Amino acid sequence: MRIRRKRLLKNFQKTTGCDTIVTFEPENLFYLTGFWGEAIGILEKNGNTTIIAPELEVGRAKDESTDCNVIKSDRGVSSLGTLKKFLKGKVCTDCQNYSMMQSLRKSFPKIKNSIEPFYRSREIKDEKEIMLLKKGSKIIDDMFGICAKKSRLGRKNQNSNLF
């Protein structure tokens, strides 16, 4: 599944002329690498995938990711310095942070910001993923049922004694 998603992102790279795709969002990082955490994911034109992670996340990133280089970096803005070393040519990103985008635009004025390719790649679901989604939905439904039994309509929160 991850290979198929990566192929879709590479097709996006080809059609838009992006040399590098960068993800800051944990869910997009997960679908690209298999690692969910505080890190930056990079997909290069040649298909190489790199994770830039803070020191506390590096070990887990190495354990949980698939076919990725993992680079240690400081957190926050200083991670952009590490990121900029990897970026060449036209860059596409899902970055939602205004100050980070401003910093990236200084080095890469033609940077393209779009979450569309990540959404498109996440539309694909296999049987395993569908089973996990069903299991998660059931857990949420069960939790809602427990909360509904504990709380009563018309009672104040302080009197409902949920926990």
For every predicted segment, state its role.
Residues G47-I51, C68-N69, K88-C92:
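Hydrophobic beta-strand segments of well-ordered beta-sheets in folded domains
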